[in-house]
Structures are given as C-alpha cells and as structure tokens.
Amino acid sequence: MNLNEKNTKYVVHLSSFPPRECGIATFTEDITNALDQKFNPSVKSRIVALNDNPTSIYNYNAKKVAGEINANEISYYVNLAKELNLNPNVKVVNIQHEFGLFGGNWGDYIIPFLQVLEKPSVITFHSVLENPDDELKNVVSTIASRASALVVMNSLSKEILTLDYQIRPEIISIIPHGIPQVAL
C-alpha cells in the first residue's frame, strides 16, 4: 500500500470508489476531492477500495487508491487494520458505511477491522434503519462503540441511532448530504 510519501499525513477512506458504479463510490470521490482541495498538501486523502467479489477488476486511479480489498473476505479487513496501524503517516480512517458494502450479516465483517484498528476512526452511516432486530442492533452498536466519531446525513438518523441503538448523541455529528457543483 502506497502511503509513504515523506512528511505527509493521510486520511484513509475505506469505501467503494469509481470506476465501480455505486452511489457511495461517487460520494467518496466527491468528499475526498473536497478534502484534498481544502487541506492538500498538509493532509491527503487515500482510498482503500472495497471490491464486491474476488474477480472484480477495476481500473482505479493510482494517485487516489492506495489499495483494495475483497469485501467478502474477513481476513482482508484484519490484515488491512494491522497494516494501517504500522504506518505512522495514517492519522485517521474514515469508513463510508452502507450495509451492502461490507461482507457478513448486516456488514459485520467491518467489526474485526475496528477491533484491530488502533487509529482514530470516523464512520459515516449512509443508511440508518429504525426498529432494528437484535442482530442488526448488535452490529450497529458494536461498530459505533469502536468509532471515534459518527457522521449521519440528517437529524432523524441521529435520533434513530440515539433511541433505537442507544448510541451516545455526543459522538454523532450531522453533515447534510451535499450536491457537487456541476458546470452548465
């Protein structure tokens, strides 16, 4: 994984990424471009792309995508966390969370990653489901318990996380989903 540029701090984003066709991929591209415009060169965004199966081959932008993992193989998550822990240039890990992106039941393959990860982590929940069954509640609560901070897109999502999942409201920030500017 190429995260060794001298005197560079990295925010590593664990997400799908273009050219994979996925709304979260587009969102991650937009947010990393905005962060890089604002903070580069002192902090740079890099992606670890989630591939949906072992035969997925995407022609990723090598300047942005530092690595990729098979989202349906739990060992990749653990190995990635260990690798990130060893890299002093990685300052924070941002996880773009959508249940369908991560392997396992309700995307629970992300949990071993978070259990091994020693870096601060920010998790953006793109979907927050109300009235969870016990399994879903356990997965989301465990993910939240390992995060340094959570981000949701609206106040209803924050309310659901607080009431239905008993997640502390002080770790949840609301950042409304924006729309990138398009030249006409």
Placement of each model-derived feature along the sequence:
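Carbohydrate-associated surface elements
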Residues: 156, 178
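N-terminal subdomain of nucleotide-sugar transferases
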Residues: 1-67, 88, 149
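A short beta-strand/loop micro-motif in the catalytic core of glycosyltransferases
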Residues: 122, 146-155
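A conserved, positively charged/aromatic
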Residues: 115, 129-148
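Short N-terminal targeting/anchoring amphipathic segment
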Residues: 68-69, 82-107, 120-124
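Short acidic capping loops at alpha-helix termini that bridge into adjacent secondary structure
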Residues: 169-172
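Short glycine-rich, flexible loops that bind phosphorylated cofactors or substrates
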Residues: 101-102, 130, 159
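Acidic/glycine-enriched edge-of-secondary-structure segments
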Residues: 54-77, 96-103
